[in-house]
Amino acid sequence: MIFMKDNIVTVEHLSFTYKDSEEPAVKDVSFSIPKGTWTTLVGHNGSGKSTIARLLNGILLPDDNPETLINIDGITLTEKTMWDIRDRVGIVFQNPDNQFVGATVEDDVAFGLENRQVPRPKMKSIVQDVLNQVGMTNFQKSEPQYLSGGQKQRVAIAGILAIGPKLIILDESTSMLDPAGKFKILKLIRKLQKENELTIFSITHDINEAEHADQILVLDKGSLLASDSPVDIFKDVSLIKNAGLDLPLFYKIKNKLINKGISIPQEVNTEEKLVKYLCQLNSKM
C-alpha cells in the first residue's frame, strides 16, 4: 500500500456493525485527511459519525475485511498497534465532564503527561503553555466541576494539546454550548490550528460549523455521500437535502443571488466578504 506522504489519515473500505444490529453503522467508507488541515464530517444524528471517531482511535475495531485500512501517521491500525494509534490521536468529546480525572485544572491537563512519564519540570512548562494558549491560566487551581461549559471545553482542549497528538478529533465538542460559547470555542480552535499547524477532524450535525473547513465529508446512514471543499459541497443543494441537512445561511443567500443572475466570485466565501462585494457592486450601478 502506497500512502500520500502529506496525508496524516488514510481510510479505505471501512465498515462496522454493532453486535446487536444486522445493519452496518458504517458502510464501506474511504477518505483521507491531509496533514495540517481541518476536515469536518457532517451528518444527522445516527448517521455513524461518532462510530467513525471511535474506529479511528481504536476504541472500536472494524468489521473483518482484507481491504479495510486505517492508517494514521504511517501506522496501520491493528490489535497490536492499537496503543500506538491512541498515542497519536486525541479526542475532545461533547461532554467534557466525562474526560476530567484531576482534582484541579492543572492536575487534569497534566494527567496525560504523567501517564507518559514526562519529567516534572517539563510537565509544568507544558501545562503552563497550553493553559495560556486556551486562555485558562487564571483557573489552573480551580476545580473543573465549577467551570462553565465553555471553560470546561477549553480545559479539555488543553489536555489534548499537552500530549501533542498527530490528529485531534472533535466529536460534537460544541453541541452542549450556547451559540456564543460555541462561536468562541470554534474561533479558539481555528486559531490554535493555524498557529500550531494542527490536523483537525471535527464531527458535527451542525453544518454551520463546516463553513471554514478545508474539506467536508457528508455522511448519511453510514455511507459517505461526498468529499469536497465547502464551496463545492454547498453548491450541491440536493446533496445536502438528501443527507437530511440544511445549508448554512450564507450559502442560502449566495445561491439565491446566483440563481437571480448575480455573479458571485468564488473567493467571496464569508458573510463579511459578501456584504462588502454587494456594496461595491451596488456603488457601480
Swiss-Prot record:
One of its GO terms (cellular component) is ATP-binding cassette (ABC) transporter complex. Residues 9-246 form the ABC transporter domain. The keyword Translocase applies. Signal peptide: none annotated. It is a peripheral membrane protein. It is found in: Cell membrane. The keyword Protein biosynthesis does not apply. Keywords: ATP-binding, Cell membrane, Membrane, Nucleotide-binding, Translocase, Transport. Its EC number is 7.-.-.-. InterPro entries: AAA+_ATPase, ABC_transporter-like_ATP-bd, ABC_transporter-like_CS, ABC_transpr_CbiO/EcfA_su, ECF_ABC_transporter_ATP-bd, EcfA_1, P-loop_NTPase. ATP-binding (A) component of a common energy-coupling factor (ECF) ABC-transporter complex. Unlike classic ABC transporters this ECF transporter provides the energy necessary to transport a number of different substrates. Forms a stable energy-coupling factor (ECF) transporter complex composed of 2 membrane-embedded substrate-binding proteins (S component), 2 ATP-binding proteins (A component) and 2 transmembrane proteins (T component). This is Energy-coupling factor transporter ATP-binding protein EcfA1. It comes from Lactobacillus gasseri (strain ATCC 33323 / DSM 20243 / BCRC 14619 / CIP 102991 / JCM 1131 / KCTC 3163 / NCIMB 11718 / NCTC 13722 / AM63).
